UniProtKB/Swiss-Prot annotation:
This is Movement protein. It comes from the Viruses. InterPro entries: Bromo_MP. Keywords: Host cell junction, Transport, Viral movement protein. Transports viral genome to neighboring plant cells directly through plasmosdesmata, without any budding. The movement protein allows efficient cell to cell propagation, by bypassing the host cell wall barrier. Acts by forming a tubular structure at the host plasmodesmata, enlarging it enough to allow free passage of virion capsids. Its main location: host cell. It is found in: Host cell junction, Host plasmodesma. Belongs to the alfamovirus movement protein family. GO terms for biological process: transport of virus in host, cell to cell. It comes from Alfalfa mosaic virus. GO terms for cellular component: host cell plasmodesma.
Amino acid sequence: MENTKTNASSSGMSSSSSFSVSYAEEMLLADEVSKINSMSILGPNQLKLCTQLVLSNGAAPVVLSLVSKEKKSILNRMLPKIGQRMYVHHSAIYLLYMPNILKSSSGSITLKLFNEATGELVDVDTDHDATQACIFAGRYPRSILAKDAAKGHDLKLVVHAVASTNANSAVGVLYPIWEDELSRKQILERGADFLKFPIAETEPVRDLLNAGKLTDFVLDRTRLGVGSKNDPSPVLLEPRAKITGKAKTVFIPEGPSVPNTTINGMAPTVRIDAGSPKGLGVPKGFTYESFIKDEILPDH
């Protein structure tokens, strides 16, 4: 069977051109394209990781086309000949979500698949805890026409995030990974829910209290005394949490022996001897000026 197409100009048949397309040749070309996409040299799983999607609190939904640039390039080249007989399959879709907010916060993530050609929606998860890391795994149970995918009417991922944190702050990061395949055969599968695999939080970094690193940190910022030949030996650190008590304040009453004197507009601080017989330990005839002259500036 042959399909004949003729192009004629308005001036007549003199400038016309005709060509024949063999149906068998079309099918042979479609088979070759399908085989190329399933060759072992390309790997059994042609997974694509495009980029990371940062999900912002309350921002507009993020929309990502799940057709790789390689497949779009093939579609644009082959569409005039076999585009009507080719399909795009999404046999594997993985969505890795990593939260950016703490467990003490709250939020939810909505993920959907949208077939722009048909207008249909498939729920991946409509109320995922934004504080929980996980991997979603699934597939789309129908084929996308190659001619629709070439025009941009393909399968799209739609993600929206809402949290109790500041507006437009990063709630989490989503890493979409998928496998798209060109084939001349359609798929007809029973729709199934996406699987969700939670990711547990890890333990704190083991060398957080590494004595050697802390010693190096101190030595970089501390000048050793004169005559020091050896570095201080590291000791085992035992972190302790202790609630400090309320600070005690000693007030010195004004009187004849303690005049209210200031220097340059600021009242100087005096060390009090709490073990003196009078409790305050302020000698008779004490003045701030004499204290500064005798104790703080003895050589002046």
